[in-house]
């Protein structure tokens, strides 16, 4: 189970504080090459760690904006994960665009997700998407965020709503059969009507998966500076809660399963890789600022991709983490993991409910789950 961080963006979104660098057109080839060399070297050093997590054979390429990279570099990085070297050219069936899993590499990934932006898909076209499929990509996560052009401009997104529509069509026509759409809610100027229209259209596309996140103000983001200057005020919690209910109601009516606080899927299309994070499965994170987890040790890279630090969790810290992550999901946590008195009180007042031999937060309380979880750890 591997996460690969691609730290490049064409521009920075208003709300984002993830580590990334501006990739300037015409001057990005050298930056991409240096990054690929460093990542391949890191993967080579960490082959034993990668092998130790292979019982769940998933790969997630996130960022940043992975879709700015050419497929040739992705192919080299994939080779460093699976063979330690550059693989041979893919067979003719893959070069022709036939969808395969993992191409010439020794083991197909059960799930291979790549994050893309709509404008890259439209600009690079169907041949680019088919190259991704030839590499083994079998799931695409696209950052739509909104279908309102005014909201997109405020976010400093490079695409307009029409690009998202085009990009989704290109992905489908190219043969992508597992698409996840990212949305954002909880923006002051996002009205109920605008959000309802975005939801209506996205659900009409029938993606296999939807992730929706409440806007948060992160310390290193441009949004934090806007707040400091008095140029933006957070949306009231009542507005955010109402939009979360809109999400839940619309997606439920459309047949999606609400399996994690911010994630919905058509039955059987839940994200395997991300679900493993919430169940605390070991994983290796490669690239600048990537995080890893194995044998009770959480570690993280510096911005240059080299190890920056680690911490070993105590038994009590593991229990608390299991509760915090598990209660974000519809599966919940095993009965007995939460202090008995706290669990009894939460069951009595409706903050928890039983689901077989497990305890979970009822869906209608998920919006306030942070407060509930804080009381239970």
Which residues fall in each region the model found?
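C-terminal scaffold of the Radical SAM
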Residues: 1, 20-49, 55-87, 94, ...
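Minor-groove-contacting beta-hairpin "wing" of winged helix-turn-helix DNA-binding domains
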Residues: 358-362
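Short amphipathic alpha-helical interaction segments
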Residues: 337-348
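Local cysteine-cluster metal-coordination motifs and their immediate loop/turn environment
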Residues: 7-18
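N-terminal polybasic/positive-inside topogenic patches
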Residues: 96-99
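Short, amphipathic alpha-helical interaction segments positioned at domain boundaries
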Residues: 366-377
């Amino acid at each position: 189970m591997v996460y690969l961080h691609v730290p490049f963006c064409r521009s920075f979104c208003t709300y984002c504080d993830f580590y990334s660098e501006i990739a300037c057109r015409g001057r990005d080839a050298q930056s991409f090459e240096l990054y690929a060399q460093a990542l391949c070297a890191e993967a080579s050093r960490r082959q034993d760690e990668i092998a130790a997590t292979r019982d769940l054979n998933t790969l997630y390429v996130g960022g940043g904006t992975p879709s700015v990279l050419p497929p040739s570099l992705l192919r080299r990085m994939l080779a460093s994960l699976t063979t330690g070297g550059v693989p041979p050219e893919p067979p003719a069936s893959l070069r022709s665009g036939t969808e395969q899993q993992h191409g010439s590499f020794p083991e197909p990934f059960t799930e291979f997700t790549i994050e893309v932006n709509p404008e890259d898909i439209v600009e690079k076209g169907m041949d680019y998407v088919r190259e991704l499929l030839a590499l083994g990509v079998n799931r695409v996560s696209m950052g739509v965020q909104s279908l309102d052009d005014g909201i997109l401009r405020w976010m400093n997104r490079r695409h307009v709503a029409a690009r998202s529509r085009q990009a989704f069509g290109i992905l489908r026509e190219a043969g992508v059969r597992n698409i996840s759409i990212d949305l954002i809610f909880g923006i002051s100027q996002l009205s109920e009507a605008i959000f309802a229209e975005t939801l209506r259209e996205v659900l009409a596309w029938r993606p296999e998966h939807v992730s929706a996140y409440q806007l948060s103000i992160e310390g290193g983001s441009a949004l934090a500076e806007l707040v400091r200057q008095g140029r933006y005020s957070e949306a009231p919690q009542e507005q955010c809660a109402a939009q979360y209910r809109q999400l839940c109601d619309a997606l439920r009516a459309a047949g999606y399963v609400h399996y994690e606080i911010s994630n919905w899927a058509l039955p059987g299309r839940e994200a395997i890789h991300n679900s493993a994070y919430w169940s605390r499965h070991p994983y290796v994170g490669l690239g600048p600022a990537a995080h890893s987890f194995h044998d009770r040790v959480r570690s993280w890279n510096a911005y240059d991709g080299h190890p920056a630090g680690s911490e070993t969790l105590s038994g009590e810290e593991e229990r608390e983490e299991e509760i915090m992550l598990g209660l974000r999901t519809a599966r919940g946590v095993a009965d007995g993991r939460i202090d008995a008195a706290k669990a009894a009180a939460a069951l009595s007042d409706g903050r928890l409910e039983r689901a077989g031999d497990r305890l979970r937060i009822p869906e209608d309380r998920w919006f306030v789950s942070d407060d509930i979880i804080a009381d239970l750890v």
